[in-house]
């Protein structure tokens, strides 16, 4: 496939995530105040979109408490920083099996909720965007399964559409993209369609360029896509996204290092992405332009 370089690119910053990065870097925000502050700094560095999870302020463990999301969104809005808020709706589909020999009982970390409960914070905060993880997968080398059934995803998409909240499809593998196209064909999600290709996360789609292009070649031409990879491949994927006609995601959810041995802030990761985008001759879009 010939190169289809993006001449205009928007940057998403994934601010904190739900993994254990908070135990590895002091820069990973935990409290709503810290998450909002980091999101604002990322926006000022050049991110048009901030993708936010929340954490328990004391333990740093992932949470889906609506009051925490409410505080994050209110703090960002009260700062009068122009940025598009994108809230995760991925929480509530987490199944942790006991072990390979004794899968039951499930571990205490298991958190499985219905579609309405998983969307409660979206109802209360009304972000411009919320995510929809369009499938299930074995997540990493543990007994954790990210579980998202078709009926649950359809209901969540219907709730978001009724709230006039734009859905960002998260596709971790080809089957997720296939299901997203079915949601579109069934009229459950409306254009314009925004999709994030989540690459290199075990055990979804690997982040080699052949697999990336296979995913991209299966995206309808009028859909808007971003893509990212994790860890040391985060910044190389900024260039890959631009060269393949897509948009960019960076942030501490996916990578905690600025370079080998140097822990990053979200703003620093965005600044580094900005340098790559501009060095490749592309224009960085602001939130107003992205909305249009």
Regions found by a protein language model. Name each.
Residues 129-253, 263-264, 268:
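Catalytic alpha/beta core domains of metabolic enzymes, predominantly
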Residues 2-27, 92-93, 97-102, 131-139:
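N-terminal small/glycine-rich loop or linker at the start of catalytic domains
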Residues 32, 69-146:
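Active-site beta->alpha loop and helix N-cap motifs at the rims of alpha/beta catalytic domains
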Residues 13, 32-37, 47-59, 84-89:
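Histidine-centered catalytic micro-motifs
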Residues 275-292:
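Mid-to-C-terminal alpha-helical segments outside catalytic/metal-binding sites
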Residues 23, 48-72, 141, 198-199, ...:
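Glycine-rich, proline-tolerant flexible connector loops at the mouths of alpha/beta enzymes
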Residues 35, 42, 53, 130, ...:
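Conserved, mostly hydrophobic/aromatic
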Residues 13, 61-89, 153-162, 214-222, ...:
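Alpha-helix-loop-beta-strand connector modules within alpha/beta enzyme cores
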């Amino acid at each position: 496939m010939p190169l289809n370089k993006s001449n205009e690119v928007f940057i998403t910053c994934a601010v904190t995530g739900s993994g254990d990065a908070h135990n590895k870097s002091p820069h990973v925000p935990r409290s709503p105040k810290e998450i909002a502050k980091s999101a604002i700094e990322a926006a000022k560095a050049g991110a048009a979109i901030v993708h936010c999870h929340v954490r328990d302020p004391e333990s740093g463990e992932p949470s889906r408490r609506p009051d925490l999301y409410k505080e994050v969104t209110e703090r960002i809005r009260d700062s009068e920083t122009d940025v598009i808020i994108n809230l995760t709706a991925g929480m509530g589909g987490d199944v942790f099996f006991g072990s390979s020999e004794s899968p039951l009982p499930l571990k205490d970390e298991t958190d499985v909720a219905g579609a309405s409960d998983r969307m409660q914070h979206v109802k209360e905060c009304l972000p411009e965007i919320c995510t929809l993880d369009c499938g299930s997968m074995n997540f990493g080398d543990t007994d954790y399964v990210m579980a998202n059934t078709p009926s649950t995803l359809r209901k969540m998409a219907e709730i978001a559409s009724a709230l006039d909240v734009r859905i960002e499809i998260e596709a971790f593998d080809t089957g997720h993209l296939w299901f997203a196209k079915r949601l579109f064909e069934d009229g459950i999600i409306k254009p314009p369609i925004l999709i994030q290709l989540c690459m290199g996360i075990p055990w979804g789609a690997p982040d080699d360029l052949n697999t990336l292009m296979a995913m991209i070649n299966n995206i309808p031409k009028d859909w808007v896509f971003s893509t990212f990879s994790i860890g040391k491949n985060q910044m190389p994927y900024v260039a890959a996204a631009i060269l393949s006609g897509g948009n960019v995601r960076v942030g501490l959810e996916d990578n905690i290092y600025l370079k080998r041995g140097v822990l990053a802030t979200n703003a620093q990761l965005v600044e580094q992405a900005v340098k790559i985008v501009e060095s490749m001759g592309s224009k960085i879009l602001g939130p107003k332009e992205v909305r249009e």
